[in-house]
Amino acid sequence: MNEAVERHDLKILGTSSSVGGVFKDVKVTGECTFGGDVDCHKLAQTGEVAIKGNLRAQDIKITGECEVKGRVDAASLRGQGELTAGGGLRIEDIKLTGGIIVTGDCEAEQVQLTGILEVSGLLNAEKLDLTLFGPCRADTVGGGRISIKRSRSGALLRPGKKLSFTARLIEGDQIELQHTQAQTVRGGSIVIGPGCEIETVEYREVLEVHKSSIVRNTVKM
């Protein structure tokens, strides 16, 4: 984060636009389009924000939709809504109800997400706690403790869509899955809950498989 530039707050009320730049705190109530990069201490939005460059912040709090064409780098993300990152995402601590859509890799220390997650590349988190409210996917999932479960209260589903998580590879130390489809699941302690379809499970310590799930191959490492 650029600290050599003097920072000022930016407040947007209603519908407006900005070229972007370096700010202290950015607060948007309404709609705002930033034409370039945004570098700030805090972004707080209620409504819709579009950033045509990269977003770099300490804290992000969203209520609504935030679309970033470039990369997102932040220490924390909180709120209710949807964040889209077109050039990858790195946020240390995520706690969100809504959706995260990333083109590229998504890296975090902790992720607590209730909603929808789409990552075209690697989803890497030391602790991942995902509650499915719709179809979710990632190419590869890696981490320490991974928990993927289905919401009990309902689903945001389009006709013909399954409430499931899909990945090519899921790898972690402790893994607990529900309603997940994967080619390979690899880890230490693995619990395959209801509604899963896994081609191969490779485990070091413990493997439990729910009677409603399908695991075609198991390998004790």
Question: Predicted segments — roles?
Answer:
Residues 1-221:
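Extended beta-solenoid/beta-helix repeat architectures
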